[in-house]
A protein has these predicted regions:
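Active-site-adjacent structural elements in enzyme catalytic cores
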Residues: 1-198
Length: 198
């Protein structure tokens, strides 16, 4: 069994993985396993009222968990895969354990390994750190911070940029830049695209 298959099998059985993305290392769990999702909150010491984002393999998978209107579809199709999290209105299939609100943040990373991990089901994507502590770029440093809390580590070495994704809320008629995270050369261009939707 290769490492990707092993990771998927672990998550399918309620396990947690540490994995690389195009931005930072993430903590991954099957979003349909509420106990596993709760473990993510415990590992991060995160307030359960704060939502987790979801990683999907492609735009077809995205539309299974979130409502995508014509305007947001144009943005999603143009800018994903990429270092963005788009907040969309969630569908009922998304558990309140993942997001207690009516919205969900969705990612399709520009990183083949990360997308492959979500080939059978969507997974959580949240930075692998204790809440309010620094985001680290190296798996060994991450494990020193969060302890022996994950079931598998996919080690891609040091992620040089290691900055969080840029978060954009597309859930209403007026798109909003929520967080300017990853240093994207495309940020000005996507802002122009968002302005056209207003």
């Amino acid at each position: 069994m290769d490492l990707i298959s092993e990771a998927i099998d672990i998550m399918a059985n309620g396990g947690i993985i540490l994995y690389p993305t195009d931005t930072v290392y993430g903590l991954g769990a099957n979003i349909f396993n509420n106990e596993a999702v709760q473990r993510i909150y415990e590992i991060k010491k995160r307030d359960p009222s704060k939502p987790l984002s979801v990683l999907v393999q492609d735009t077809d998978s995205l539309e299974l968990i979130a409502d995508v209107n014509m305007n947001s579809r144009e943005i999603v199709n143009k800018w994903l895969p990429g270092p963005f999290t788009f907040i969309l209105n969630k569908k009922k299939i998304v558990s309140p354990y993942v997001s207690a609100s009516t919205k969900v943040g969705v990612r399709i990373p520009d990183y083949k390994i990360a997308r492959a991990l979500a080939s059978l089901f969507p997974i959580t994507t949240t930075s692998a750190n204790i809440t309010n502590e620094c985001t680290l770029s190296n798996p060994q440093e991450i494990l020193r911070q969060i302890g022996d809390t994950v079931d598998l580590v996919i080690d891609a070495g040091n992620l040089n940029k290691a900055k969080p994704s840029t978060v954009i809320d597309l859930s209403s008629s007026k798109p909003t830049l929520v967080r300017n995270g990853f240093d994207s050369n495309d940020l000005d261009s996507i802002k122009d695209d968002l302005d056209k939707l207003v």
